[in-house]
């Protein structure tokens, strides 16, 4: 169940307030430097929390935003199938290039096996590599039963995640859902935060995710969503 403050925060939210909880995202692998320049500049103009880009685009995005907002990047994306050491190295690399937040994809196979110790170990290795940045752990929530999602959230949080995140936006199972956000929010309580991403394409959905307990949104169509607030 969403906290009452989550519901009240979403009601009457201003354009500026909504932008401040958005990671303006461009993760298409074919994105060009011109695309990165555009999205990074948009994120600054909107007043977003961050611009979220692929590792190869971090340095360029950091140059464009020039410290005015944060740069976020992804690790083990989108499948989560890299070994933990590789994820840790990738995380350290993107931080060195200018990322202040890291969104890692957890070992989805381990989740499917119910091996929550392996899930925690995967997260812990990345956490150890980048101890001073915000770490968000992508669980690909559409794949799992409520029970597995709860246990995955606990495992990620226990291993040092600052956020648990619903989705990559690339899996055919789907993106964020109100039910998944509500479950994840109920587990984390005040100990961590929730990022909803994937299939958030309009203002009503964005506000519903926040009302369900999301603290951050990952979206690509930020301008249209903000325009829904006038």
Where are these regions (language model features)?
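C-terminal alpha-helical cap/extension of soluble enzyme domains
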Residues: 1-22, 28, 46, 190-230
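Hydrophobic faces of well-ordered beta-strands that scaffold small-molecule active sites
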Residues: 18-26, 51-53, 70-75, 102-104, ...
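Alpha-helix-loop-beta-strand connector modules within alpha/beta enzyme cores
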Residues: 55-79, 114-144, 174-198
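Glycine-rich phosphate-binding active-site loops on the catalytic face of alpha/beta enzymes
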Residues: 73, 77-78, 96-111, 158-174, ...
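Conserved anion-binding
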Residues: 80, 91-92, 101-163, 167-170
């Amino acid at each position: 169940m969403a906290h009452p403050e989550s519901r009240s925060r979403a009601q009457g939210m201003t354009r500026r307030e909504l932008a401040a909880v958005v990671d303006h995202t461009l993760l298409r692998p074919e994105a060009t430097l011109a695309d990165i320049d555009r999205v990074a500049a948009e994120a600054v103009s909107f007043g977003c929390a961050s611009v979220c880009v692929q590792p190869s685009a971090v340095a360029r995005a950091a140059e464009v935003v020039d410290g005015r907002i944060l740069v976020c990047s992804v690790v083990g994306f989108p499948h989560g199938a890299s070994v933990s050491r590789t994820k840790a190295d990738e995380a350290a690399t993107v931080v060195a290039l200018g990322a202040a937040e890291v969104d890692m994809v957890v070992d989805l196979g381990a989740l499917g096996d119910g091996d929550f110790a392996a899930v925690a170990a995967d997260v812990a290795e990345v956490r150890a590599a980048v101890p001073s940045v915000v770490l968000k752990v992508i669980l690909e929530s559409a794949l799992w039963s409520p029970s597995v999602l709860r246990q995955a959230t606990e495992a990620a949080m226990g291993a040092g995640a600052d956020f648990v995140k619903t989705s990559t936006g690339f899996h055919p199972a789907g993106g964020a859902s109100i039910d998944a956000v509500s479950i994840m929010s109920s587990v984390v309580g005040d100990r961590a935060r929730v990022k909803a991403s994937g299939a958030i394409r309009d203002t009503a959905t964005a506000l519903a995710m926040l009302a369900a307990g999301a603290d951050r949104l990952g979206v690509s169509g930020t301008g249209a969503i903000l325009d829904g607030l006038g």
